């Protein structure tokens, strides 16, 4: 069976790994030059993604097409005919859509001293893991873009991601850290991490970030 996977991020690679394990032929279409998706932009995840992708990279049943853009999809009998913007035509028995996500852009909070989590990661990454000297007081605001009138659902990731950012920060420096949250929704050992961070002086303040 020929399986076409749209998206070469962690979801697409995970799907490819399963399909290859079942001896199917797999083609991954990635809109950027290299697979990685959002994880490739997160310094602390990049190595882990590379290791994960390396497990299937040389599989003879796998084809990865970078800078791919789909312009047309037709259903023919039981197969899909896919045309790319460079004129290349592909045929697949199954299509998996793993097109990733678009990070929320908090325009209402924009400012010189306001960073999204991805931007914060990039700052540390560019400095080879060092925290800028003027980052001596840091506030993490949770639920930005969710738990609001327009989007009332919990993102289910920002609490865990913030704990990771706090841990990563404290491994590099000892700034004053305050976490502002609506509700804390952790998983497993993250509850113990929260207590450990509180014990080291990290402040957790219930607040409304909407």
Language model: regions and residue ranges:
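Rossmann-like dinucleotide/flavin-binding elements
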Residues: 1-35, 73, 101-186
